Regions:
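N-terminal amphipathic/basic leader segments beginning at the initiator methionine
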Residues: 1-31, 330-332, 347-355
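Glycine-rich phosphate/pyrophosphate-binding loop regions near the starts of catalytic domains
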Residues: 14, 22-177, 183, 188, ...
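Short, ordered loop/turn segments at secondary-structure junctions
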Residues: 18, 65, 105, 137-139, ...
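Active-site-proximal betaalpha loop/short-helix elements
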Residues: 20, 107-109, 201-277
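Short Gly/Ser/Thr- and Asp/Glu-enriched loop/turn motifs at secondary-structure junctions
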Residues: 43-45, 275-280
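Helix N-cap motif at beta-to-alpha junctions
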Residues: 285-290
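Short amphipathic alpha-helices in soluble, non-transmembrane regions
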Residues: 292-302
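Acidic, Ser/Thr/Pro-rich beta/coil linker or hinge segments at domain junctions
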Residues: 300-359
Length: 359
């Protein structure tokens, strides 16, 4: 009898495997890592860190593919998103984004004006942070092969603040959130569901390096940092808890959620903690520096609502990661959400697919 190589429970790949939640983790753990895991330089991070020649600095690199629908949305488009997304992944490793590559998969019949508008948007974001384009590629596919336009990007940057890792949480660390959550996911949901909101709700899509740069140049102890994209804040915190085998306690009252986002969540029965963001990051930092770090973030428009939302209450000395799907069963690796009355519940790792093609 042929030995089964994986424990993956599906014969075909479900849509939920692209959610950034438990199903994504399962796909990576059971299909990709058994074959490719030994080759990974930086497993579990949004960007890999490597050395190049005689350079005194390390470099961070991240690749990402963008398939959002619709390709134009309130607050941005797929072009802006592709630059912000890759740039932010590199910045989360304490690096300054410097170079980017672009790959365009274009559906036959896409309007010239639509494509040009997206290219102009890319140019605007590249110029904003002085990124340099190393290489680019275009493919045009027969109508129906894809939906309008997909973009792949790879970003490279020089590491200015080393040691940042989801495995580096320490007991007592303060958890900082840079901005209100859920705006990107809620705005895309509202657009697709045809919810007519008389408000300013729009995606928070933005490059975060400029806001974070002052932290990279100082003696700040940033142990972990992640932008809360697919799976939202819930996915980030649960990934950290799993990687560091830590218990994280979050104060629900300290998490800022715009009223428009709350409204969409109530209408559609969503949890804001699980909604995607494209201009929000979480940090786990040395407790004695947390207030100063918050003040620095608040000095930038993108971080004006930065706040301490919780802390790391326990860290296992073994740091042996468990399955993300079983966080709630583990005595250490879990995220606990405390409400204003003092009641506590687990902030669950996202299950299923809330919204396909969110980024």
């Amino acid at each position: 009898m042929q030995k089964k190589h994986t424990q993956y429970p599906h014969t075909t790949i479900p849509l939920a495997a692209g959610s950034g939640g438990a199903a994504s983790d399962e796909l990576i753990r059971e299909i990709f890592l058994p074959h490719l895991g030994r080759f990974f330089v930086s497993e579990g991070e949004d960007a890999g860190v490597f050395s190049a020649g005689d350079s005194a600095k390390d470099f961070a690199i991240s690749t990402d593919s963008f398939v959002i629908s619709p390709i134009f949305f309130n607050g941005g488009d797929i072009g802006k998103l592709s630059i912000c997304g890759s740039s932010n992944d590199v910045a989360m490793m304490g690096a300054k984004p410097e170079f980017i590559t672009l790959g365009f998969m274009i559906e036959e019949g896409l309007g010239q004006d639509e494509l040009e508008k997206i290219i102009k948007s890319i140019a605007c974001e590249v110029e904003r942070t002085d990124l340099k384009i190393l290489s680019a590629d275009t493919k045009v596919l027969p109508k129906g092969s894809i939906d309008k336009l997909f973009i792949n990007t790879t970003c490279i940057g020089k590491v200015l603040k080393s040691g940042i890792s989801s495995k580096a949480l320490q007991k007592g660390d303060k958890i900082i959130l840079s901005a209100p959550i859920g705006a990107h996911g809620a705005s895309i949901f509202a657009s697709r569901e045809g919810i007519g909101l008389h408000s300013n709700l729009q995606s928070d899509c933005a490059q975060l390096y400029e806001m974070l740069e002052p932290l990279f140049g100082g003696d700040f102890e940033i142990h972990a940092m992640r932008d809360a994209t697919r799976g939202g804040l819930s996915a980030v915190l649960n990934e950290w808890a799993n990687a560091s085998k830590a218990q994280i306690e979050i104060d629900e009252e300290c998490i800022y959620i715009d009223e428009e986002v709350r409204g969409v969540c109530e209408i559609l029965g969503l949890e804001a903690y699980m909604l995607a963001n494209e201009g929000v990051c979480a940090l786990s930092v040395e407790p004695s520096q947390a207030s100063e770090i918050c003040e620095i973030l608040r000095s930038h428009p993108l971080g004006r609502y930065a706040s301490i939302i919780g802390e790391v209450t326990e860290v296992s000395s073994t740091h042996k990661a468990s399955s993300n799907q079983n966080l709630a069963k583990d005595t250490k690796a879990r995220v606990v959400l405390k409400n204003k009355w003092g009641s506590k519940r687990f902030m669950e790792y996202p299950q299923g697919e809330l919204l396909p093609r969110i980024c």
